[in-house]
Regions:
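Short solvent-exposed coil/turn linkers within tandem alpha-helical repeat scaffolds
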Residues: 141-145, 173-183
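N-terminal "domain-start" segment that seeds a small globular fold
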Residues: 186-203
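Bacterial N-terminal signal peptides that target proteins for export
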Residues: 2-10
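Short coil/turn linking the two alpha-helices of tandem helical-hairpin repeats
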Residues: 156-159
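A non-transmembrane, solvent-exposed segment enriched in polar/low-complexity residues
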Residues: 24-138
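Amphipathic alpha-helical repeat scaffolds of TPR domains
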Residues: 143-154
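Bacterial N-terminal signal peptides
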Residues: 11-19
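Alpha-helical repeat scaffolds
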Residues: 135, 163-172, 198-203
Length: 203
């Protein structure tokens, strides 16, 4: 039937892409690795709008590789099976190895290579997990790219106007291209209205 041929073609095409792209281009996000899993599952990377960026079938104890794709360095959702994690990805290879338990994800043990910028961002996240009281501040010597600054704001997700405004001010207008930067622009706008509202209770 028409449907099954279409499906087969897509599966064949995506595995063919997985096999050949690495020789075409050197830049781009590519996720590779080998996971101990009990049954086949899927790896997906989505942007903050939910758009699918990369995906790959995972087979037990077999090496896998997604295609390579040029991306805007930003926060993406990495989904393995039913587990989701927000991670800052850039245009290079990321390696994942370890054990993934789809039934009890908390039993999983995965190790990542190639996410150094994401680990850097973790260092600046507030220890205070309450979004109403937490603040974010960067030391003067912090070496963060504009995309990392907006990614930090997104990951921290605090309600403090001044924290968000300070981070946004570190990103020039022409560098606010990532989805997390657009999110931060909106966030600051909304929080500024709340501040004005709080300062003018008569309105």
């Amino acid at each position: 039937s028409m449907i099954s041929t279409k499906k087969l073609f897509i599966l064949f095409f995506s595995s063919f892409l997985c096999a050949t792209t690495s020789s075409w281009c050197k830049d781009g996000l590519q996720i590779k690795g080998k996971l101990r899993i009990l049954k086949p599952t899927t790896l997906q990377v989505n942007d903050l709008n939910g758009t699918l960026i990369l995906s790959c079938e995972l087979q037990p104890n077999k090496e896998f590789a997604t295609e390579q794709k040029l991306i805007q360095p930003d926060i993406y959702t990495l989904r393995i099976g039913k587990t989701e994690e927000k991670i800052y990805f850039e245009n290079h290879e990321v390696n994942i190895i370890g054990y993934y338990d789809e039934t009890n994800p908390e039993q999983s043990s995965l190790s990542f290579k190639g996410i150094d910028s994401f680990l850097t961002l973790q260092e600046y996240l507030p220890a205070d997990k309450d979004p109403d009281t937490a603040t974010v501040s960067l030391p003067a010597n912090a070496q963060l790219s504009p995309n990392m600054v907006s990614a930090l704001a997104y990951l921290a997700n605090v309600n403090d106007y001044y924290s968000n405004k300070k981070l946004l001010d570190m990103i020039s207008d022409d560098e606010r291209n990532s989805l997390s930067a657009r999110w931060l622009v909106e966030r600051v706008k909304i929080l500024s209205h709340q501040i004005i509202g709080a300062e003018c209770p008569d309105f």
